[in-house]
Amino acid sequence: MATATLTIDLDAIAANWRALDQMTASDCQTGAVVKADSYGLGAAKVAHALARAGARRFFVATCEEGADVRRALGSGPQICVFSGHMEGDTALIRDFDLTPMLNSIDQLTRHFEALGGQPFGLQLDSGMNRLGLEPGEWEAVAGFALEAGPELLMSHLACSDDPDHPMNAEQLGAFRAMTDGTGVPRSLSATGGILLGPAWHFELTRPGIGLYGGRPFEEARPVVRLSLPVIQVREVEIGEPVGYSNTWTAEHTSTIATVAAGYADGLPRTLSSRATLYAGRVPCPLVGRVSMDLITVDVSHLPEVPETLDILGPHQTPDDLADTAGTIGYEILTSLGRRYQRRYGALAA
């Protein structure tokens, strides 16, 4: 079979959620971010696993994502939408019982006119300058917005992956200035904010990348293994090139495995002649270009060529691969291609 297998450990995702939940006080709820199809790992199955672990509030990017999660979970859990109430979203918000995080005066107006009485939250800009009501706007509308009974006041940290960055304290101060005394539950922290400490926790946290084994949650359990099938093996003589543009040439007689995955499957082209794959615990260098469907790997040092080679797993996390590619683990996870056969179960040692 020429299809790679992406193994996803739902028990590990649930364990990571529980570990992050235990970092906060008992009166602080821990939500779960399942946007972008749970970072590419399958929102329906991931949301089910997190609900079984105890999560009761889920966050998505769009109403369409929210509808998919609601179909998977049924009634009960709250599903919050970061993009708020966009034009054309009214029917989805109503029909799938979604809670938009309203982020502008226009959205406030749209929501109150179209769905007065429907739950909502408010997103405030504490300094990231991306989404949310700015302090001046909030001051102007806080009275009637609070009177309408928001479920949540939230903001987002720009630099929480760097605990020493002064922006963390600046945003904390700005958020408190806008929300102290409102009596409304508040949320400022994703994974990085949880790790900053209790001052950033408020009444709700909403971890994302930490659930899926990523930084900055260094104690997270690994969640994915990506095993790529070897299609063909050939001997390459000294001086012979491999792959497009002849970017790699054999300096000695080499055994080269052609492996079924490429940039169409989410492997960045910047991994060319830089990445490492694994045969069990043994590293094997990627040689030559990453092409659309194929990569080539030097397996000269293996006593026997295996049927598959791992590019993600216990010996190489998405963050490790991202470091090699010059990107971030989020991009590696969310780019994992549709051609992979997804299998849910424990990761083999």
From Swiss-Prot:
Q: Which reaction does it catalyse?
A: L-alanine = D-alanine
Source species, domain of life: Bacteria
Q: What is its EC number?
A: 5.1.1.1
Which Gene Ontology cellular component terms are annotated?
cytosol
Cofactor requirements of the protein: pyridoxal 5'-phosphate
Active site per UniProt:
K35 (proton acceptor), Y244 (proton acceptor)
Q: What class of enzyme is it?
A: isomerase
- Give the metabolic or biological pathway: Amino-acid biosynthesis; D-alanine biosynthesis; D-alanine from L-alanine: step 1/1
Which of this chain's residues are annotated to bind substrate? Answer: R130, M292
Q: Which residues carry this modification: N6-(pyridoxal phosphate)lysine?
A: K35
Q: Name one Pfam family in it.
A: Ala_racemase_N
Name a biological process GO annotation. Answer: D-alanine biosynthetic process
Q: Which keywords belong to this entry?
A: Isomerase, Pyridoxal phosphate
What the entry lists under InterPro entries is as follows: Ala_racemase, Ala_racemase/Decarboxylase_C, Ala_racemase_C, Ala_racemase_N, PLP-binding_barrel
What GO MF terms are annotated?
alanine racemase activity; pyridoxal phosphate binding
Q: Which family does it belong to?
A: Belongs to the alanine racemase family.
The record's function comment reads:
Catalyzes the interconversion of L-alanine and D-alanine. May also act on other amino acids.
Name of the protein: Alanine racemase
What gene makes this protein? alr
